[in-house]
Amino acid sequence: MSDKLPWIIKYRPKRVEDVVDQEEAKKLFLPWLRSWLQGRIPERKAALFYGPAGVGKTSLVEAAANEYGLELIEMNASDFRRKSDIERIAKIAATQFSLFGRKRKIILLDEVDGISGTADRGGLDAILELINITKHPIVMTANDPWDQKLKPLRDASLMVPFYRLSERYVVQVLKRICAAENIECEDEALKLIAQRAEGDLRSAINDLQAIAEGYGVVRVDLVRALLATRDRQYSPWEMLRNLFMSKYIWQAKRAVTHTDLDYDTLLQWINENIAVQYTHPEDIWRAHEALARADIFLGRIKRSLSWDLLPYVFDLVGPGVALARKKSKFKWAKYQFPQKILMLAKTKEVREIREAVAEVFAKRLHTSKATVKREVLPFLFIIFRERPDYAARIAIGYNLTDNMIKYLAGPLASKVKEHMNALLMRLEKPATVSTATTATTARTTAAETSVAASRAAKRTSTSRRRTSKSRRRGKGSGTQTTLF
């Protein structure tokens, strides 16, 4: 322990080969960097390093700059907030060579996922502008590059994934540091540090330095006493990687229980990527069988609130899926975002309008929204797309909004609105016209009543005269009858 310099800086990799357990990242990054150095500007002028913290993203850039003799210009996301900073960085990116001779440069933009696309002035637009004008390679780092706001950066960059380091490589680095610092250490203690760091080499080195400088020795009992287990929450991609790499039940179970995904979304992620990771049909069948059984248990939990069944769900989606791999070899695969979730996101607005339409008709028809969607909506679609005139009456009567009309009528929405306007104009005629019409009708009715009354009077008078004559004849005929 010759000085007080933090070990993560003192033992930072000086060469590319010193960056351990990131071979895939090296295979993608180094050819891209060499094309810059050879004067062949690649199609994608920037590279985006993404992965969990402490796995070597920044270290690989620094090691490459040192090995290839490049001037490293390192900036954080906070440097992209003011216009003056953006202009300064733009000048650096547009300058061909360094002030210190003809030395090439490499630009490192750290933690770009911390930039707000709306709040920070410049922000992502400034980075995209730098990528367009740069004459030097630009490398960006991010822990989670899958935020929607970072999509323009993903499209403009070479995506370079970094993964959590294996326990074996972390232990090797810790052993080298202990040897260089003349620290007495136990192998089991180093393994315990590596396990609790969970692939984060930076955390492991910091833990090692804290124990070594405090006690002068690294023993198992000290590690257990001083280091609490880090309760990490895995991202979806980390969860999948850890799940499919699991060799033991506890590893698989830990992968699915240490994530912020809800139960349904967890099943969607695993279901989407089983066929991506597994290649043998029998392995795929076994994994989907376990997932289907987990879905059954989850359905029972929702219906009966029997949360005591939840451990069975985790046993099936974790060990059940992980141990289904018998014949497929593990491979580094690009996992996919669940298509069902993407479709739900794309159709969110349509589904909201559908719910609003169902609610309007359910209130007026005194039924449930489910009944409206099942029994009424199909007929509404037909009416609105076949008979715009009838649809206009329904739209006015139920006070439907423009979005509701567009949803029901589709391309005929404009015709429905034309009929609505015509109908409303007819209903909104001036009141004087109605009064005049009513007066005319009243006069006509009165005249007709007068004529009818006159005719009735004449019929009554005629009837009376006929009755009088009949009576006189009746009396005469009675006398004659008596005489005979």
From Swiss-Prot:
Disulfide bonds: none annotated. Keywords: ATP-binding, DNA replication, Nucleotide-binding. GO terms for biological process: DNA replication. Residues 456-475 have a biased composition (Basic residues). Residues 435-455 have a biased composition (Low complexity). Residues 435-484 are annotated as: Disordered. Signal peptide: none annotated. Transmembrane segments: none annotated. GO terms for molecular function: ATP binding; ATP hydrolysis activity; DNA clamp loader activity. SUPFAM superfamilies: P-loop containing nucleoside triphosphate hydrolases. ATP binds at G51, P52, A53, G54, V55, G56, K57, T58. Pfam families: AAA, RCF1-5-like_lid. InterPro entries: AAA+_ATPase, ATPase_AAA_core, P-loop_NTPase, Rep_factor-C_lsu, RFC_lid. Belongs to the activator 1 small subunits family. RfcL subfamily. Part of the RFC clamp loader complex which loads the PCNA sliding clamp onto DNA. Heteromultimer composed of small subunits (RfcS) and large subunits (RfcL). This is Replication factor C large subunit. It comes from Hyperthermus butylicus (strain DSM 5456 / JCM 9403 / PLM1-5).
